[in-house]
Every structure is written in C-alpha cells, then in structure tokens.
Amino acid sequence: MLRLPRITRRALSSGALAPHFDRPLPPPPPAPPAPLCALPPLTAPDALAPLTRRTVRHADALVARIAAAPAHPDPAELRRVVKNLDRLSDVLCGVIDMCELVRNVHPDPHWVAAAEKTYETLCSFMNQLNTSTGLYDALVATVSHTFPGNPLSPAELRVAQTFLSDFERSGIQLPPGVRAKFVRHSDNILSLGRTFLSFAAAGPSADTPIEIPEPEVLLAGLSSKFVASLPRKKRKGPALLAPGSWEAQMIGRYADNEEARRLVYIGSMREDKDRVYVLETMLKERAELAHVLGKETWADVALSDKMAKTPQNVLQFLTSLATHHRPSAAADVAALQRLKALSTVSRTSSQLPTVHAWDRDHYAEQYAASLLPNGSLPSITPYFSVGTAMSGLSHMLSRLYGISFKPVSVAHGEVWHPSVRRLDVMDEHGKRIGVIYCDLFSRPGKPSAGAAHYTVRCSRRVDDDPSEGDGLPPGWDQHLGKGMEVQGEALHGKEGKYQLPIVVLTTDFGTVEESGPALLGWNDLETLFHEMGHAIHSMIGQTEFHNVSGTRCATDFVELPSILMEHFISSPAVLSTFATHYTTNEPLPIPLIQAHLQLDQSLKALETHSQILMALLDQKYHSIKHGEQLDSTRVWNELQSQVGVIPPVRGTAWQTQFGHLYGYGATYYSYLFDRAIAGKIWSSLFARGRTGPAAANHDPAAAEDILSREGGEAFKEKVLKWGGGRDPWEMVGDVIGGAEGEQVAKGDEKAMELVGRWMIK
C-alpha cells in the first residue's frame, strides 16, 4: 500500500503559489511581444490568415498521402494510416481549438474577428474531410489488414474505431449527392448553433425593459435606497429594469410582494420570437441531418458512440430518476409552500398556496435562513482566497496523483489580459507535463458565459511522426510562417517524446487588489475544483494519439473526473487541510464547514429534479423526426406539467437561455449519469466508510485516508491515464471491481440500470 507522510498544516504551506494568485502581479519586463500561449505562429491577429492557409496546405498533403496508402507498394505505408489520420486531426484541431479560445476570451476585437474567420474556414474544411471516401477507404483497408509481425496495437485500433465512427456518422457510405447534403446541413447547424449560443450568453433580451408600477409599494422588503436608485419612466412613473439584470435578480429574491416577483420573472423569461426561431430551426436542421444519415432522430445519431448507446436507454435512465426524485422534490416544494402560506396574510383557504417559478428563489432564501439558529452563518469566503484554494488543490493532487502546480511568470504578449496567470504542471520527478492558463478574475467586458475549460493543445507522441513522406517540398511553408508543430518532450515512464497539453480555465471570481485577494464563495470553490478536474484529465491522459487524449472521450464520460473533484471539496477532512483565513491564517472552524455543507444540501432534491427536467427536455427536443413540426415552448410547458413540481409560466420561453442544447445536444443527461458513477467511485476508492458523520472527521488520519495515494493511483491508472483510449464501461468496471464491476463493464442495458441504482442510492 502506498503511503505518504502524515498531513500537517506545515506541509501544506502555500509557498509561492498563493501569492501568484492573491497579489497583483508586476507587469512583465519590456521585451518584444511573445506569441499568444507561447505558440510560435500566434504573434498578431493578421498571422492567423497565413496560418490558416498553411494548415489547409499541410492537411491537403496528408489527405493525399492517406488516400494513396492502399495502393502503395510498401505495406508499411498502409500501417501508418492511423498515425497519419491522427496527425491530420491534430493539424486541424490545434488551430481550431486555439481559435475557439481566442474568439471567446480575447478582449481585442481584431483577434476575435481573425479567430472567427479561421474557425469557420477550418470547421467547414473538416466537415468536408469527414465525407472523404479516400480517407475512409484507406482506414477500412488498414483495419482489415493483418500486418504479420506488426499488428495494430489496441490503442491504434481504438483510434481507428473512433475515426470510423466519425466517418459513418457523417454518412460516408451515402451517394455523393447525399454526402453534399450532410456538409450543407452541418454548416447550417454550426452557424445556427453559434447564434443560439450568443443569445444564451447574452442573457434575456433587453429591448423591452421590465416595468414595476408603484415601486414604493411593490418593492417592500428592499431598501429605500435601492428602490430610489431605479430609473423611472417619469418622476412618479413605474420603475424600469433591464431583464436579467442584477436589480431584477435582487427583486426576484428579496421582494416580499408576489406581483413584483412575477413581473420580473416574466420580463426576464419572456418569449423572444427571433430566439425561438433560431433554436427551433437548429433542432429541425439536426432532425434533417439525422434523416440524411438514415437515422430516425438526432438523438439516435448523437448517442451511437456514447456509453448510453440509444435514446431508449437514456429515457429509461431519466424516467426512473424522475420517478424516484419527484416525491422528494415535491417535499422541498411543500416546505416552500408553508413559508408562502405564512406570508400570505389574506389567505382564507386551508390548502397550501401554489409555489410559482417566481416564488422559488424568494422562499428558498427564507428556507435557508430558517435552518440557521440566527438566520445567517458567518461567511466562509475569508478562508478561501483563490491562492489558498490553488495551494490546496496542488497539495491534494500531489498526494493523489503525484502532480503539482508551479507558478510561472508570463512573457509580454503571452496572455490576452494581464490578470491571466500561468501554471506549469509538474510530476514528482520535477518534469513539466503541461501548462494551465488561469483566466479566473473579473474584468470589464469579460464574457459572462460562466466557467469553462478550453483545450488549446492535446497531448500526443510526436517523435515517431513519419513526416518525411508527406510529399511537401523543402521550403513549402517559407512564405506562410511557422506552424503549430513542436519537437516534443520526454515524459517519465513513457517511450518517445510528447507534445504537452495546454489548457485554459476561465471563471469570474472578482478581482485581486493591493488591499486584498479575490475571495471565493462555496459555489465558486466547487466551480474551481470542477473545472480543474477537466484540466487534470488533460494533464494525466497523455496518450500516444491526439484523438483520444485527455478529455477527448465520450460526452457521457467526460464529466466524471470533474464531478469526482466536487466530492473532495465537499469533505470537511479535505477542507481542513488548507482552508485558512487570508489575514489571520486561522484554520476554518470545522462546525462552520459542516453548517455550510448542510446548508448547501438544503432543497437538493428540487435542484436535482430540475436537472432531470432539463435532461428530459434535451431528449425530447432531439427526438423530433424529419419533417415534424416543433413548438419548443409547448414541449417545455407540457414537460413541466407532467413531470415537474412547479407549474409552467405562460408567455415565457426559458428554453432559449439553455445554451447546453447546442453543445450537449441529446447528451445533457451526462451530468446526472457521471454524478452517479462519481458517487460510486468516491465511496469505493476514497470515502471507504467515511460517509455521514464519519466523513466529518477532521483529524489528519481522516484526510490521509481520503487523500490516499492508493485510491489516487487506482483512479489514475484505471481511468485518467487512458483519456478516451479505452472503452469507458471497461474503465468504470475496472475501478469499481467485484461483481458490480464485472456487470457494469459489459456496458449493456443492465449496466445502465445499475448506474441508475447508484444515483438513486
């Protein structure tokens, strides 16, 4: 059994890591600008156009080489097809993924515009390659060949199968004219999806302000100063609010008058016909694309290579969860109803009043206060500066996986804003294994779409690239500038040299001032640990092949490492190892941790049921068939009436703010699915009997058991290191072990049922 020295606070001293995040950084010394993210081609916005041309030229050469491989006289060239396809994917994705970051986070509109253009060009180019019969035929010939004495490895076969699935999902076996339809529909979906996401990120339309008549009366419960600060139509006229604004949120949460809350809710969720049209057109385009591919629905297409496999399996999983959770969610609503009854002075009926959507936040706030002896809790934010949390993360990861964070100063021009910090991820041998850029702090104009993890570059082995056979003449790129290729670095325990991963985490955690650090609330802390779970998957999942590296795995598996990280941060024993007051250095009192964790669990059934509803909505929207009409608002209202515990609100169209409908189309269930698996792994590997009161034990032995290297190594070796290079069902079965592990490893309907039971437990 692997054991590390007993945890002490001295061992967890923050060193240089906490100041790296908790103090303003001095500007880098004057020097010629470095390229963005230290990637040589990214010197200026106008460098993206030649990089795009270079990328297409290199990709064209690789396509020609791969397509010619079956007719090549040397069988070794056919043997290289999987490697060369992976190189082709890396050449394109290395630029596309970088542009995805730039167009979402860069404050310079010139960079954003250039990235948008490159992104569109290369995504369209990639969609065309997905229908290339030359590439597909070469891959089929490769996997059909025996290659005596040098067969394809399991990793190569996994990568090949991933590419074959991509081709077949793109209708590769269809006639040429039909394949052209695939490209057209895919381009339409890409364009509509981007528009839909921009609407969702922007929040409710502000074209028509919310009007609150007689604000002095309707806004009782809010301070007179707040009410007086609201703009008016005229001196004694109604107060005007921007939908979704901070002021609107304050009224929705704290106004005692139900009519005020109702006006704000409807105004913030009102139906915008243009936005509804974009969503419904995108969903219909997906249904049309499914029809082109010979599938009934987009859900059939999207789930064919996921763990769940079919829409029927997903619906069974979600329906069983909804049936199980609905009584508990209804009990949560009943608690809110009782609070509403107490505040409804004129009520004459003995029946409890209905809790509407505009009541939920208001009475949830009151319910939380009712659980506390004095109506409130001392804040925990002073114990969680960003630097303290990062130090705790680094030490936790060191104990579990043998990796840690090293703060690194950035060069002038390396990052898109001075507040961005760089971390090098180090192994136990002092070797860098990757880079994380942390864009964690608020700034004017920063996109407010929430936290995100961007993979700028995936890992892959590069020293065995057969680039001499690409058919490109010497100096072919001289007029196009540098590419994204690297020489690679040696990694401990791995043969060859690897391209190291680069990831970016973005959040909105306040600002660092000379007067003090940015402090994290509980939700912020969960967000940081969750997003870091994705980053660590990228760092540890360094496979030989780009296409299965790190987070490039099934959508309904990719959230597992991140949700597992949430379990660690919910452990008082783990929190007690690093949470200290940013001014006094006093440890966070354990009773305060426990009280906040208990508060965080209040109304949890209602929140879980809301997630189930959203996942069901995603399935319903993506289960429409070719030619079917769709009224997305009617579908949402019916679902709330049939399965929900809070009635729908007519005249609203919340679904246009559900941005995950694009990125997670038909796979939003993944959060619930991976939560079930993460809970099982947590109890099997890490908690091991420390559930309930035992989990609150905060002596060093409790932390040692939870942060056990034995458990960390098991998860690292059986899950994280594989990225997407192994069947996820087999990974889950391997890490769970025993009879349940054997059953779940089969990945059949019974395995799905078993995961559902884990969630219910």
Curated annotation (Swiss-Prot):
UniProt subcellular location: Mitochondrion matrix
Record-annotated active site: 531
Database matches in InterPro entries: M3A_MIP, MetalloPept_cat_dom_sf, Neurolysin/TOP_dom2, Pept_M3A_M3B, Pept_M3A_M3B_dom
Note on how the cofactor is bound: Binds 1 zinc ion.
Reaction(s) this enzyme catalyzes, per UniProt: Release of an N-terminal octapeptide as second stage of processing of some proteins imported into the mitochondrion
UniProt entry keywords in alphabetical sequence: Hydrolase, Metal-binding, Metalloprotease, Mitochondrion, Protease, Transit peptide, Zinc
Gene Ontology molecular function: metal ion binding; metalloendopeptidase activity
Zinc keyword on record: yes
Major localization class: mitochondrion
GO biological process: peptide metabolic process; protein processing involved in protein targeting to mitochondrion
GO CC entries: mitochondrial matrix
Cofactor(s) required for function per UniProt: Zn(2+)
E.C. number: 3.4.24.59
Enzyme class: hydrolase
Binding locations of Zn(2+): 530, 534, 537
Keyword Hydrolase: yes
Matching PROSITE patterns: ZINC_PROTEASE
Highest taxon of the lineage: Eukaryota
Family classification: Belongs to the peptidase M3 family.
Function, as annotated: Cleaves proteins, imported into the mitochondrion, to their mature size. While most mitochondrial precursor proteins are processed to the mature form in one step by mitochondrial processing peptidase (MPP), the sequential cleavage by MIP of an octapeptide after initial processing by MPP is a required step for a subgroup of nuclear-encoded precursor proteins destined for the matrix or the inner membrane.
Protein name, entry field: Mitochondrial intermediate peptidase 1
Species this protein is from: Cryptococcus neoformans var. neoformans serotype D (strain B-3501A) (Filobasidiella neoformans)
Gene behind this protein: OCT1
